[in-house]
Curated annotation (Swiss-Prot):
It is a peripheral membrane protein. It is found in: Cell membrane. It catalyses: phosphate(out) + ATP + H2O = ADP + 2 phosphate(in) + H(+). Its main location: membrane. This is Phosphate import ATP-binding protein PstB. GO terms for cellular component: plasma membrane. It holds the Pfam family ABC_tran. GO terms for molecular function: ATP binding; ATP hydrolysis activity; ATPase-coupled phosphate ion transmembrane transporter activity. Belongs to the ABC transporter superfamily. Phosphate importer (TC 3.A.1.7) family. Part of the ABC transporter complex PstSACB involved in phosphate import. Responsible for energy coupling to the transport system. It comes from Dehalococcoides mccartyi (strain CBDB1). Residues 5-246 form the ABC transporter domain.
Length: 251
């Protein structure tokens, strides 16, 4: 099966500072791909390049190609709004809107033109169920999303992404602000979601990458040192730098 996303010869710069160097990497469809590496190695920049979130940063510039279903998302005539509908993002800190739980999830569909209440009701319930949150909030949909626990807020943010029916979900350190129990819930949720979505996750947590992902790429100072099946990366790394990082010798 052709990868959902392919990165080919990508260099990325903030003004004159090069952050990514000749990256070639695949993101297989309906699989979880982890991007690991020490702080400042370019992980989040790489992830954000997959839906052009870096466009909003002054001086940001990408060379090379990022292909979604074999279409270069950096083509001049590409519809970026539609791209971000197809490739949704969950951030490090849960960031629910100061709105009701219902309105948080309905926000995207409304922006995209859905106005019929019965249809919004369906989308909100489906998305909250997919995010494993429905049973916890179904009787309190009118309450503020900010009143939820940290783990619930992050699942609400995942539901908000699911409501716009993406094909790819990007997760930038989605569990770093959560307790171990909430982290486990998110990891279990990821395994369920990959049945229907392609997932890319940035994580500092080696155990999480080993547990939750199918493929792993190791970045170091902007270079993709190694990429392959997660089991092989963690049990038989080909590069000594990979072995040193995953065993905690640096990072």
């Amino acid at each position: 099966m052709d990868p959902k996303i392919k990165i080919r010869g990508v260099n990325f710069f903030y003004h004159k500072h090069q952050v990514l160097k000749n990256i070639n990497m695949d993101f297989p469809e309906r699989q979880i791909t982890a991007i690991i590496g020490p702080s400042g190695c370019g992980k989040s920049t790489l992830l954000r390049a997959l839906n052009r979130m870096n466009d909003i940063v002054s001086g940001a510039r990408l060379e090379g190609a990022v292909l979604l279903d074999n279409e270069n998302i950096y083509s001049p005539n590409l519809d970026v709004v539609n791209l971000r509908k197809r490739v949704g993002m969950v951030f490090q800190q849960p960031n629910p809107f100061p709105k009701s739980i219902f309105d948080n999830v309905a926000f995207g569909p409304r922006m995209l033109g859905t106005t019929v209440q019965s249809r919004l009701d369906e989308v909100v319930e489906k998305s909250l169920r997919q995010a494993a949150l429905w049973d916890e909030v179904k009787d309190n949909l009118h309450k503020s999303g900010l009143a939820l626990s940290g783990g619930q807020q992050q699942r609400l943010c995942i539901a908000r992404v699911l409501a716009i029916e993406p094909e790819v979900i990007l997760m930038d350190e989605p569990c770093s602000a959560l307790d171990p129990v909430s982290t486990m819930r998110i990891e279990e949720l990821m395994q369920e979601l990959k049945q229907n979505y392609t997932i890319a996750i940035v994580t500092h947590n080696m155990q999480q990458a080993a547990r939750a992902s199918d493929w792993t790429g190791f970045l170091l100072t902007g270079d993709l040192v190694e990429y392959g099946r997660t089991g092989e990366i963690f049990s038989r790394p080909r590069d000594k730098r990979t072995e040193d990082y995953i065993t905690g010798r640096f990072g």
